[in-house]
């Protein structure tokens, strides 16, 4: 499950966004990225495969605009396209006008992409998110042809064409705004006295404010940073996709960070037990679609031929990952009739298993750092 963080206000935005992404690491990810709005110098994007610390290192090597006040960031689990820098968020539109981070799945992205290709658009990634960034830009430039940089209108028009689930943050190179919108994917707006922090959940927000709006489906937030002549502080307008102004409830969050991370439960175990149905749904939502490709195999395309030709599959893991492997064994054998063996990684590495040409070994590790599993591989 991906993570989103955005900031607009008087502090250094890149630090708040990167620190916020660290707070969301528990959600899991394979790559991370940040886009910073450099006032008159456009939008700068930094992306990295691997840990948020790697992103932080890459970003620290850049010369940044000390006057920047807007940034958006993202941690990604691959669904459309392999884990690679080109597929990481934020995505830029072809003309460099729009930058976007997105959680969810755009089910009709192929239809939108064909339309964009017919309009001369080219794509650098394998993702549905880049399609959405360009679809917003397509509307944005149609609006600008009439003399207006109306980012919120472009987002509204684009989303009316979208089928699927999304939580998005959008910035453009011409205005000092973040536009946020959601459908079937969580998004929280933290409201400070002179700043706003936007995130997938409250964990990156509560250090800066305890007043939070949780967007509902079909709602948008337009957060604009005013010029110094107009006070220099940001404000927010909440609307729906029909451009009707709404007044959502502002919740004051009293829970501490560890309580928020536990979702109100006493332990992480209870939280994870109660989240199972939602977690399974989120996993499937990124893999199963009604499009021309009903099964999305993002992250494993490079080894898909070997998987399809497998004579036998070995799954190695530890702890709860081992239990997940047992479920995988049942499903794989039922659906494919390929035999599967599930082993504890700590035993697999010592027992000299019989692995023949054409067999496939799959390791499972929630953290990616389980020592026995890495040693067994």
Which sequence ranges carry the predicted segments?
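Conserved short alpha-helical segments that host acidic/polar catalytic motifs at enzyme active sites
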Residues: 1-262, 266, 275, 281-311
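Glycine-rich phosphate-binding loops that contact phosphosugars or nucleotide phosphates
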Residues: 305-377
């Amino acid at each position: 499950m991906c993570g989103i963080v955005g900031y607009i206000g008087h502090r250094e935005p890149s630090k708040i966004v990167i620190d916020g992404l660290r707070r969301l690491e528990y959600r899991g990810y394979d790559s991370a990225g940040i886009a910073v709005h450099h006032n008159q110098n456009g939008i700068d994007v930094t992306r990295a495969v691997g840990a948020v610390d790697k992103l932080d290192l890459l970003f620290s090597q850049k010369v940044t605009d000390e006057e920047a006040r807007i940034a958006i960031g993202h941690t990604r689990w691959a669904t459309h396209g392999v884990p690679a820098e080109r597929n990481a968020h934020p995505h830029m539109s072809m003309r460099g006008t729009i930058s976007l981070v997105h959680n969810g799945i755009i089910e009709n992205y192929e239809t939108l992409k064909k339309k964009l290709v017919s309009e001369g658009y080219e794509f650098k990634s394998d993702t549905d998110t880049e399609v959405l960034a360009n679809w917003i830009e397509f509307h944005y430039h149609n609006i600008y042809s009439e003399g207006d940089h109306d980012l919120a209108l472009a987002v509204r028009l684009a989303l009316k064409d979208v089928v699927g689930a999304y939580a998005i943050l959008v910035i453009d190179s011409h205005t000092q705004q973040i536009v946020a919108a959601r459908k079937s994917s969580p998004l929280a707006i933290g409201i400070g006295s002179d700043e706003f922090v936007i995130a997938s959940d409250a964990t990156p927000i509560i250090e800066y404010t305890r007043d939070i709006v949780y967007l509902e489906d079909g709602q948008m937030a337009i957060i604009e940073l005013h010029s110094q002549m107009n006070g220099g502080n940001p404000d927010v307008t909440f609307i729906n996709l029909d451009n009707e102004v709404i007044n959502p409830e502002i919740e004051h969050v009293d829970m501490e960070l560890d309580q928020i991370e536990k979702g109100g439960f006493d332990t992480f175990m209870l939280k994870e037990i109660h989240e199972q149905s939602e977690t399974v749904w989120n996993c499937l939502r990124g893999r199963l679609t009604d499009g021309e490709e009903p099964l999305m195999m993002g992250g494993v395309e490079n080894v898909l031929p070997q998987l399809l030709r497998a004579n036998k599959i070995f799954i190695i893991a530890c702890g709860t990952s081992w239990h997940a492997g047992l479920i995988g064994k049942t499903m794989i054998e039922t659906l494919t009739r390929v035999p599967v063996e599930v082993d504890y990684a700590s035993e697999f590495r010592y027992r000299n298993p019989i692995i023949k040409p054409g067999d496939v070994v799959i390791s499972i590790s929630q953290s990616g750092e389980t020592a026995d599993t890495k040693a067994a591989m």
